[in-house]
Amino acid sequence: MSKVQVKKVVVAYSGGLDTSVIIPWLKENYDCEVVAFVADVGQGDEELKGVEAKALSSGASECYIVDLKEEFVKEYIYPTLKTGAYYEGKYLLGTSMARPVIAKAQVEIARKVGADALAHGCTGKGNDQVRFEGAFAALAPDLHVIAPWREWDLRSREACLDYLAERNIPCAASLTKIYSRDANAWHVSTEGGVLESTWNAPNEDCWVWTVDPEQAPNEAEYVTLQVAHGEVVAVDGEAMTPYNALLYLNQKGAKHGVGRIDIVENRLVGMKSRGCYETPGGTIIMEALRAVEQLVLDKTSFEFREELGIKASHLVYDGRWFTPLRQAVFAAADELAKDVNGEVVIKLYKGQAVATQKRSANSLYSEDFATFGADEVYDHSHAGGFIRLYSLSSRIRALSQNKQ
């Protein structure tokens, strides 16, 4: 198939080996100008150190580094948290939530520089190619999309390193890379290496942020979270931005080994993959939000929020962020979160984050009605009529079966 003709491409650039190869490869194979776009989603200063110089030395004409940290947490993480989304019951969607904010910013840079194409470094095996290209389709259907991993014949790190060496392009990457990692403000994921066999227990070097829970402090630590409309607005009495609150809780949780999971998940493309994910601050925040929900949501609202969480987890994981259904699901969750206001104390100890105290001005919990002692506000005799009506369909079914 003949290649499309493009003049200027904006590539999502990380500074790693793959994207360092993509820049000269695009120039050689498409005879185009390449602009590097770097998204700062909280992956850390070390990851961003010297990234602009790397991009330019690889052949990029320009390099844009865009700070997306606050937008990522405020506009992508919290709306997802309000749904209660856990993919397949465990995964807090750290990589999945980051892709749409990155793709959106990449499109904005493309518009700014007058590019006619977008490129990414996602492999043909993973979920991210779908997430990026799904976002591009929704936000910039007029732009061409180039996925080098689906076109080139470079199939190993050695081949990529040789490619750069032949062109005298400097690269600090090593020949051996044990793990594949992805980090942002919300989490860090580790895949590959020893984890490729499900019979291998994770090595300690599979974990990056968190201490081994067995080696965590022997004394519990408590953090107090103030929640307003389903979002953390203060921690330990200090008002914080969404990103700063997450950063603070990441540090607290990591110290106590909170937020580790080792899972095998179903990828969108059909295969299963295994990963070790660390989400210390996010685990604390989710525990706090669910604790307040227990106080303020009535039974049917809580059931509906759980249904929203399951649907949202698949929409986000599957790269359907910029769709009407995702917007509708999140709008419903946002409506339920209006009364999710309160204060929660979370105990951090040996890998666990547990809500030990909670209160809310919107609480539906009444000590007068909930007491197990003598009370004067609840007439127990009223329960009989309710139960008879509640079980009426079962009674009718049984009587009908007895007649047959």
From Swiss-Prot:
Q: Which domain of life is it from?
A: Bacteria
GO annotation, cellular component aspect: cytoplasm
Which GO MF terms does the UniProt record name?
A: argininosuccinate synthase activity; ATP binding
Q: Which Pfam families match?
A: Arginosuc_syn_C, Arginosuc_synth
Its main localization is cytoplasm
Where in or outside the cell is it found?
Cytoplasm
Query: Which residues are involved in binding L-citrulline?
Result: Y91, S96, N127, R131, S180, S189, E265, Y277
Q: What class of enzyme is it?
A: ligase
Catalysed reactions listed for this entry: L-citrulline + L-aspartate + ATP = 2-(N(omega)-L-arginino)succinate + AMP + diphosphate + H(+)
- Sites where the protein binds ATP: A12, Y13, S14, G15, G16, L17, D18, T19, S20, A39, G121
Q: What EC numbers are recorded for this enzyme?
A: 6.3.4.5
GO biological process annotation, one example? L-arginine biosynthetic process
Keyword DNA repair in the entry? The reply is no
Protein residues bound to L-aspartate? T123, N127, D128
Q: Which InterPro entries match?
A: Arginosuc_syn_C, Arginosuc_syn_N, Arginosuc_synth, Arginosuc_synth_CS, Arginosuc_synth_type_1_subfam, AS_cat/multimer_dom_body, Rossmann-like_a/b/a_fold
UniProt keywords (A-Z) are: Amino-acid biosynthesis, Arginine biosynthesis, ATP-binding, Cytoplasm, Ligase, Nucleotide-binding
Please give the pathway this protein is involved in. Amino-acid biosynthesis; L-arginine biosynthesis; L-arginine from L-ornithine and carbamoyl phosphate: step 2/3
Quaternary structure?
A: Homotetramer.
Q: Which family does it belong to?
A: Belongs to the argininosuccinate synthase family. Type 1 subfamily.
Name of the protein this chain belongs to: Argininosuccinate synthase
Gene name of the encoded protein: argG
